[in-house]
UniProtKB/Swiss-Prot annotation:
InterPro entries: UPF0178. CDD domains: PIN_YqxD-like (cd18720). This is UPF0178 protein Reut_B5138. Coiled coil: none annotated. It comes from Cupriavidus pinatubonensis (strain JMP 134 / LMG 1197). Belongs to the UPF0178 family. It comes from the Bacteria.
Amino acid sequence: MQVLVDADACPVVVKEMLYRAAQRLEVCVTLVANKFLRTPPSRFIRALQVPAGFDAADDRIVELVIHGDLVITADIPLAAAALEKGAYVLDPRGSWFSRENIQERLTMRDVMEQLRSSGIDTGGPAPYAAQDGKAFAGQLDRFLARHVSP
């Protein structure tokens, strides 16, 4: 089992939690981004830089992910693709994507995109807050406790 991270928009606090988990549990964490990422020296942490381009990081994650992996992303289409390959998908705010909720989330994303393209200001996500980090940490810890042998 590996952890794949959609790192371009991933909050720093989430990356730091993942670095600590990688070291503590000796689980491979791979961060994928279209920019250079500085990561701590560790045989369990690697950064992959992909060429700049629409969905290049997402496409690389889909290539790498296998059944049973954990993907960290807020990108709904990427989450859908990872779920199709049998991965677990957690967003940086601590919410799980699942086969049961992905279609609803894709539909809502499409509706919001249509509203924005027609000129309606839909706002954006709320700023990342401490409670988001706590929710993510709790979900990550529970997942790793069930899926990684110490």
